[in-house]
Amino acid sequence: MTTITLVQGDITEQRVDAIVNAANSSLLGGGGVDGAIHRRGGPAILNACRDLRASHYGAGLPTGEAVATTAGDLPAEWVIHTVGPVWQGPGSDPTLLASCYRESLRVADEVGARSVAFPAISTGVYRWPVEEAARVAVEAVRAGETGVEEVRFVLFDGGTFAVFEGVVG
């Protein structure tokens, strides 16, 4: 049984086995949580991402998929990079967003991670409404068959934390 915990804070400070990065498909860093993870984790993460691009993901990591790299200088063993979908307005299909969580947990199992910190994937510049994103995230984690013992949602601001708190119950 996976325990879900909520934290308001900085995901780059979480002492967990794996930190999930809401990456862009290039895997080369960007803004928001992606940029923060690359900055705090140091060059080892970028180098590992470049190697992945050269060996497996020449066109970039597809939306909804996940892949692990070293965590570099972060207080974790792994960073699991996943590419969330961009909100296209009402009627947007949440399937790819749910896939980000399922695939990240699958990769966590592959690397032996027992504690995983997730951001609120796609709720920043990708504009997914927090209420729906929280519901999709929590449902995907609860429905997942995984050896991960703790999923920690690390929410940057109080409003997002409150929404996730309402969904988790």
Language-model region placement:
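Phosphate/ribose-phosphate-bearing ligand recognition and processing surfaces
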Residues: 86-169
